[in-house]
Every structure is written in C-alpha cells, then in structure tokens.
Amino acid sequence: MSYLQSVPPHDLAAHLADHDGKSVLRFITCGSVDDGKSTLIGRLLVDAKLVFEDQLTNLGRVGSSGAVNGGEIDLALLLDGLEAEREQGITIDVAYRYFATSKRKFIVADTPGHEEYTRNMVTGASTADLAVILIDSRQGILQQTRRHSYIASLLGIRHVVLAVNKIDLVEFRQSVFDEIARDYKAFAKKLGFASIQPIPIAARFGDNVISASPNTPWYKGPALLEYLETVQLDPPATERPFRFPVQLVMRPNANFRGYAGQIASGSVSVGDPVVIAKSGQRSSVKAIVTFDGNLTTAAEGEAVTLVLADEVDASRGNMLVAPAARPFVADQFQAHVIWFDANPMLPGRSYILRTETDSVSATVTALKHQVNINSFAREAAKSLQMNEVGVCNISTQAPIVFDAYKESRATGNFVFVDRVTNATVGAGMIDFPLRRADNVHWQATDVNKGARSAMKSQRPAVLWFTGLSGSGKSTIANALDRLLHARGKHTYMLDGDNVRHGLNRDLGFTEADRVENIRRVAEVAKLMADAGLIVLVSFISPFRGERRMARELMEEGEFIEIFVDTPLEECARRDPKALYEKALAGKIANFTGVSSPYEAPESPELHLKTVEEDPVALALKIEAFLDRHREEK
C-alpha cells in the first residue's frame, strides 16, 4: 500500500491531474465518550505519514501536561484543537481533516461522543457517505452508540465500519470481538445500512489501522484504511434528478442574465429543458458559464452560472429543475426531526424553517410520535426534548420546494431557527408531502378586507395587550372598548379567561398548552381583522416567540403590541382572583411570574405603566395612538 509523498515542483501539474481524478470519500467517526475516535484518526494520519514533523513536535509540547506513559504523544490532539477539548480530554466541536492516499481522497469529520453535543454529530453526518462507529471492547454497545447509529441511518449514511477499539485491553480475544459484532448487527438490522464491516482495532498502537496486526491472526478482513480506500459507494448524485438552487442573478450588463449557484444533484447540459419549480415557467439552457470558461455539461457539486434561452422570472431562492422529474411544492409535509435546544419543541409554536432555497414561518401541527433510540419503538409524546428524535407533521406559511430526504439529501433537509434568539434549534429530514396540502385550497370571495373596513369607516387593527396576571390588561382593554364604541367603531374584545370557557376549554397551563392557546387566538384575531374589526386581545401571552408569530400573521402595521407593565409585587398585592395566593402556596402549577417565566416585550408599540396612571387615562393614550396611526396610514 503506497501513500502520497512530497512531489517535486516539475511534477506538480501531473500530480494535480492525478489528484483530481480520484474519488472522494466523506466519513465520520462517532460513538460514545472515550471510545477513542480522535485517537483513531490521529493514528491513521501518523502511520500513513500524512502528518508533518513540526506538527508532531508541536503536539509533544502541547500535550506534555497530559502525555501518557512517560511522554507518549496524545494523538487525539491532532483533532482536538479547542482549548476546552485539550483541557477536558474530550471532543466538543466537529473537527474536519482532509487527506489523500494513492487510491482515494478523504474528508473525515471527527464528531463528539457526549450526548450534549449531538447537534455537532448531526452536522458532521449530514454530508458523510460512511460512518466509522467506535465501540470500546470493554464496554460493548452503549446508549450513545445506538443514538449515533440511528442518527447516521436517519441522515442517509449507508455504510458503516464497526471499529471495535481497545481490543488490546481485552487481550485481543476473538470472542469479545465476535460478540460485539454479532450484537451490533442484530441491533442495526432495522437501520437499513447497505454494509457493516467490523474491524478489531487498537488505535493507540495502530493494530489493524493501516495494515493487518500480528496480534489478531484470527481476523481475516481488511485493515481500516484498506477498507476506506476500496469500499464501493452509492451511485453518484449525477444520476439523480437535476436540482439547481439559484443563489444569485448575474446581470453585469444589459446583454447578459445568468443564474449562479451550485448544482445540488444531477447534471445539466447545454440545450437541456429546465423549469422553475414554483412557477412552472419553462426554458432551456443556452450556456453554462464558469470562471474558467464555458462548459457543455456540469454535474452535482459544481458552481456554475446558467444562461437560459428565454426571459423568465427567476430570482434568489428559486430552483431550476428537470421538467420530467420535478420536486414537491407544498406547505404541509411529514418529517423526522432531531431537536437540539434545551427548550423543548412544542407543537403549535412558530419557528423559522430554512431549506436550500426557502426561509418561511413554520409550525409543528402534530408530533405523531417520539422514536425510542434503543428499541426504535414509537412512543407517544407531547414535546421533544434536547437530542430526542420525533416524527412530525409540519405546516409552512407558504409553499416550499423539496424532495424526500431519502431521494436527495441536499433538497430534502431543513433546520428550525428560534424566532427570538435566531439559534438553530432543530434539524429535519422530509419524508413526504401530506395529501391534505393538495386537497385544501383558498376560496376566493368577492368582498375583501378593504371593502369591509371601508363600510365601517375604520382601519382594522389587532391591539395585543400583554402582561402579568393582575397587571390590568383586561381593565384597560375594556375601558378602551367603551371609548371606541362611543365613537361608533366596530370592535371585539378577546379575553384570556373568556376564551378558555369555549374555544380553548381543552387547554391547560403547561408551556405546550400556552403555545397552542396563543396560536388559536392569533388565528381568530386575524379572521376578525379580515372582517374589518378593531380587535382587542387581552392575554398574558408570556412568550416573545408566540407574540411574534401573532404579529407575522397580520398585515404590516396591523398588529399593535401593548405592554401593560405592572411590577410582580403590585400584581400580587392586587390579586383580584386570589390566584397569586394559591400559586405561592403551591396550589397552582405553571403560574406566570411565580413558577413559569414571563418574557417582557423588547420593543412594544405602547408601554403602559399602571402604577403611574389609572386605566381610563391609559385607555385615552391608546386611543390617541390609534388616531395618529390612522393618519399616518
């Protein structure tokens, strides 16, 4: 087995040409904590002579405080680059390494084993073709081994190397290796891997890493690197349907219009017909432009600019596709979701959903079940906690373009983003569109919002009163309702307690129920605004994310957030319904301000302080604001 050595300058062109012709294998190392993932990759790189001398010298200095066995270099330090990783002796972030042998190029992602960093493992696995799953010979299959195996399968990885590591610590016994391999294959039978290759390894000493070890004469299979060089991958994405997400419209002069991006799957040639996925507009490829000159054909992974034969309405976020094999365009679908955030995923809560081409508001309409990663059983659940996996129905505010994830990883995935923090809180793999998306259509009506509001001589608005229980929301809203009614305005007041007697009588006060409570009320308020009414919504609505969701349902300028700011002590002193007394005594659970948080508005349209003015004066302030608001319109 030969490896790349230093190349003389005069042979550089030939070397690069040879290098470009090699296939690329992307793989990850994963498994439980301290199974030796980073050490294995470090050993592979060192023994294959793919690490420079100065790197090894530097590792000796960096690792001196944590060196083992009288100064032996800790090979894991080749991958663990963060200071916290070196201090704790664990992997936290995903570490990528690029290397090549005479047969193949490799991109390896060393992923963390701690459950806390599952999100980083998902990141590494999302583009991998193969997973090297490590198991400590002394420990056997652990929960995190199962978790990583399931996630690898879920993310479309088809090939697995089962690296049974630290085989030296069980005296290289074949019986231990055979038992672990047998148990893992039985466990993984339902995961659908195309191949599983068990290999006994002692990563610290290099046994079976790049060559066969004399310590395991009973093992007749390939060494790790030999297997990585020869494993047959799935068919290339060029055989899949053509998908081209438009990233930029190139318009350097009046005579040129091109659509720039990277081909997500498939291939395209000059003259091929294409269609814009959402609009259905058709054209054909006139030219394929690159920095190095025009091409006749381009394939998956290439960054190109496509010039079309016709003038079409395409912009950033559109997708050019093959007319004979179009993706789905729908606003409802089923997906597997892996949750990353410490705050649980709640059905009814609004998130930002981002795909290759779209960024839209989305809601989990149903959590069908949670997946038990040990047994793969489907278990009922009302929410997903951090690192849990569930199957969900998802609804988006506008149709998006997608493929089933099993057909196209690039166009079948998405992430959930928190509306308040902008943190990525979950990742999803789309299974299929829901048929209801095709069967439910908007019914056009002749009388619209403009006609209804004109008849009432008023501008529709949603006045959203938020604040603690006892802050005075309903009192102020009621006073304002009287003022507006006296002026002949058409209003309606939605009060939290009143709505719970009917529409929301089935909801409690858990975080999930509060989210659904606000979602329903926001939709009702939207319908009332569409009827031309001024809607007064008086709800605690403790979460910023739900209030933002309500705002985005309305037209621009229609939603007016009113923060009724009363100190908790004052609310408890008033306690008109004796709720604080019960909450403080532990008789009411999940009570806002006592045992459940309240997220105050950061930039409300109106900020009212009830300890400074009486309800009527505050209602007059809101009335004056509405008058100015109408004039500005």
Curated annotation (Swiss-Prot):
Region (G5): 202-204
Keywords for this protein: ATP-binding, GTP-binding, Kinase, Multifunctional enzyme, Nodulation, Nucleotide-binding, Nucleotidyltransferase, Transferase
Region annotation G4: where it falls in the sequence: 165-168
The protein's enzyme class: transferase
Function: Proposed to provide activated sulfate for transfer to Nod factor. ATP sulfurylase may be the GTPase, regulating ATP sulfurylase activity.
Classification lineage: Bacteria, Pseudomonadati, Pseudomonadota, Alphaproteobacteria, Hyphomicrobiales
Residue ranges of the region described as Sulfate adenylyltransferase: 1-458
Catalytic activity: sulfate + ATP + H(+) = adenosine 5'-phosphosulfate + diphosphate; adenosine 5'-phosphosulfate + ATP = 3'-phosphoadenylyl sulfate + ADP + H(+)
Domain tr-type G: 22-236
Binding site for ATP: 467-474
Stretches the record annotates as Adenylyl-sulfate kinase: 459-633
Subunit note: Sulfate-activating enzymes, NodP and NodQ, may be physically associated.
Region listing for G1, in residue ranges: 31-38
Pfam families reported for this sequence: APS_kinase, GTP-eEF1A_C, GTP_EFTU
PANTHER family xrefs: TRANSLATION FACTOR (PTHR23115)
Protein name per Swiss-Prot or TrEMBL: Bifunctional enzyme NodQ
Positions with a binding annotation for GTP: 31-38, 110-114, 165-168
Example GO biological process: sulfate assimilation
